[in-house]
Curated annotation (Swiss-Prot):
Cofactor: Zn(2+)
Residue stretches making up the MsrB domain: 9-131
Family label: Belongs to the MsrB Met sulfoxide reductase family.
Residues annotated as catalytic: 120 (nucleophile)
One example GO MF annotation: peptide-methionine (R)-S-oxide reductase activity
Protein name in UniProt: Peptide methionine sulfoxide reductase MsrB
Any Gene Ontology CC annotation: cytoplasm
Lineage per the UniProt record: Bacteria, Pseudomonadati, Pseudomonadota, Gammaproteobacteria, Cellvibrionales
Presence of the UniProt keyword rRNA-binding in the record: no
The species this protein was found in: Cellvibrio japonicus (strain Ueda107) (Pseudomonas fluorescens subsp. cellulosa)
GO terms under biological process: protein repair; response to oxidative stress
Catalysed reaction, written as an equation: L-methionyl-[protein] + [thioredoxin]-disulfide + H2O = L-methionyl-(R)-S-oxide-[protein] + [thioredoxin]-dithiol
């Protein structure tokens, strides 16, 4: 059973703010230039807001000018999973937490070297490692 299946909708709503729930569980998107981390460049690691899984290292974060936190690679090859997103009449690659299926954002092929990728991530879906997460891995 995946971690996502262990929690029902009521528990996710209890543990997340309404905005976090809309983005993480309903695949929403925060408005550009409004998220907590779009201009954050402290060292550290970014974890999944829902389950605490390590997702991105701050040293791979860059200013893409798009208004969302952007990274050129995940922390590990297995941190995230990708799937086709055809919502809103577009073809995009959605990025989700591999552990709990939290919607993180999208990945695009207009990023910097060394990968050429831009993981465009909602601030509401992540937390910097020095901050509290809604669920810690031990509670899943």
């Amino acid at each position: 059973m995946s971690d996502n299946e262990k929690f029902n909708d009521a528990l996710w709503r209890e543990k997340l703010t309404p905005e976090q729930y809309r983005i993480c569980r309903e695949k929403g998107t925060e408005r550009p230039f409004t998220g907590e981390y779009w201009q954050e460049f402290r060292p550290g690691r970014y974890h999944c807001r829902c389950c605490g899984e390590l997702l991105f290292d701050a040293d791979t974060k860059f200013d893409a000018g798009c208004g969302w936190p952007s990274f050129y690679t995940p922390a590990t090859k297995t941190a995230v999973r990708e799937q086709l997103d055809t919502s809103h009449g577009m073809y995009r690659t959605e990025v989700l937490c591999r552990r709990c299926d939290c919607h993180l954002g999208h990945v695009f092929t207009d990023g910097p070297e060394p990968t050429g990728l831009r993981y465009c991530i909602n601030s509401a879906s992540i937390v910097l490692d020095s901050e509290q997460v809604s669920f810690t891995p031990s509670t899943l």
